[in-house]
Amino acid sequence: MLCCIRRTKPVEKNEEADQEIKQDGTKPEENAHKAATKIQASFRGHITRKKMKDEDKDGENDTAPDESAETEEKEERVSPSEEKPVEVSTETAEESKPAEQPNSPAAEAPPTAATDSAPSDTPTKEEAQEQLQDAEEPKETENTAAADDITTQKEEEKEEEEEEEEEEEEAKRADVPDDTPAATESQETDQTDKKEALDDSKPAEEAGKDQNV
């Protein structure tokens, strides 16, 4: 009995599943297929994205070697131009060596040029000194002129003071009665008159005395 029951139950389940399928109209297999297709599509998209990123990285890496190659080419182009001045400098040094030999006339020429340049420097110094002297002379003359003006002013002031003192003394003398010659003459005449009067009076007195006798 138990075996029969166990066998009958799954059959009932299948029937129920069939009924559900009939109602929905879709089978679980179809749902699983759809889910699988979605998963595959998403996986493919992920793979394609990775490929795109890898391609971008590869492109950048490709451009970087190209740039490095261009820079190397530029350096190679520049390096010969840099080497040329070095060669030119060595050539000029080699050319200058014979000129520096003691027996060559080129070696004797620079001292003469130096001697010529030395006198040209000395006149310039002398001219500068002369200019300084010329500039100092007007200053000295101005200073002397200023000193002379000061001395003359002082002398004039002294003279004015002396004149003022003399005028003051004269004014004082004018205020005080001076012993003029007229006054002295009048005094002398008065004295002479008095003497004459005395002389005249003496003979008269003598005559009176004689009469009395």
Swiss-Prot record:
Comp. bias regions, Low complexity: 102-122
Disordered as annotated region, ranges: 1-213
Biased composition (Acidic residues): 57-73, 157-169
Lipid-carrying residues in chain (S-palmitoyl cysteine): C3, C4
Recorded GO MF terms: calmodulin binding
Domain of life: Eukaryota
Stored InterPro entries: IQ_motif_EF-hand-BS, Neuromodulin, Neuromodulin_gap-junction_N, Neuromodulin_P_site, Neuromodulin_palmitoyl_site
Domain (IQ): residue spans on this chain: 32-61
Transmembrane portions of the chain: none
Entry keyword Phosphoprotein: yes
Biased composition (Basic and acidic residues): 9-33, 74-86, 191-213
Keywords (A to Z) from UniProt: Calmodulin-binding, Cell membrane, Cell projection, Developmental protein, Differentiation, Growth regulation, Lipoprotein, Membrane, Neurogenesis, Palmitate, Phosphoprotein, Synapse
Pfam families cross-referenced by the UniProt entry: IQ (PF00612), Neuromodulin_N (PF10580)
GO biological process, one term: cell differentiation
Bilayer disposition of the protein: Peripheral membrane protein
GO CC aspect terms: filopodium membrane; growth cone membrane; synapse
Location within or outside the cell: Cell membrane; Cell projection, Growth cone membrane; Synapse; Cell projection, Filopodium membrane
PTM field: Palmitoylated. Palmitoylation is essential for plasma membrane association.
Signal sequence segment: none
Family assignment from sequence similarity: Belongs to the neuromodulin family.
Role of this protein: This protein is associated with nerve growth. It is a major component of the motile 'growth cones' that form the tips of elongating axons. Plays a role in axonal and dendritic filopodia induction.
Subunit note: Binds calmodulin with a greater affinity in the absence of Ca(2+) than in its presence.
Protein name, as recorded: Neuromodulin
Gene that this polypeptide is encoded by: gap43
